[in-house]
UniProtKB/Swiss-Prot annotation:
Gene name in the database record: hflD
Pfam family, one: DUF489
A single Gene Ontology CC term: cytoplasm
Protein name: High frequency lysogenization protein HflD homolog
Subcellular location(s) of the protein: Cytoplasm; Cell inner membrane
Superkingdom field: Bacteria
Bilayer topology: Peripheral membrane protein
Similarity comment text for this entry: Belongs to the HflD family.
Keywords assigned by UniProt, alphabetized: Cell inner membrane, Cell membrane, Cytoplasm, Membrane
Family matches, as Gene3D superfamilies: HflD-like (1.10.3890.10)
Amino acid sequence: MTPRQEQLIALGAIFESAYLVDRIAKTGLAGEAHLACMLGSLLVRNPKDTLEVYGGDDLNLLDGYRALASALERNPQSLQREPLRYSLALVTLERQLDKRDDMLQLMGRRLDQIQLQVQHLGLTHESVVAAFASLYEDTLSTFRQRIQVHGEMRHLQNPANAARIRALLLAGIRSARLWRQLGGHRWQLVFSRRKLLDELYPLIRRN
């Protein structure tokens, strides 16, 4: 796997988190396997490669790949605006988080505790999702710049949906961190669009 392909997997995962946030906000729905894939990425330490972070394959990242492709293609008719907005906001938030060693250490400790919950309850149990959501609230929600999620009020006001959205935003931050560690930069989305698309299309077709 090439370095750019590794980056695309992580970048696609950012967009997958954003896509799921948008879907829950607008419909109240999200696939269990997709949710588990993204939440599980928060608990993977020292992976041997990027795919291992997401369960060993990228089957559950397809919607993210498509949302990313729509952003890179710049076609107003197919552009998924909210997933793009959330994804860019996640990348920006991650850069702020990187300057906060104290917060990173806190997140590491809390994720260790959540790992124990997962062993007993499973990744998508409401108590586990609530724990991820609480971690997001206690850390990233304290930054001046917050991510404003738009959708149907009846879905946004549902406590379970709100928890899933926050948990997915936390997962998006994890993927944004991985993307940057793999050499990803925002300018690539502007100046390397064609190169990214040339490698992204085969990933979409493969799935």
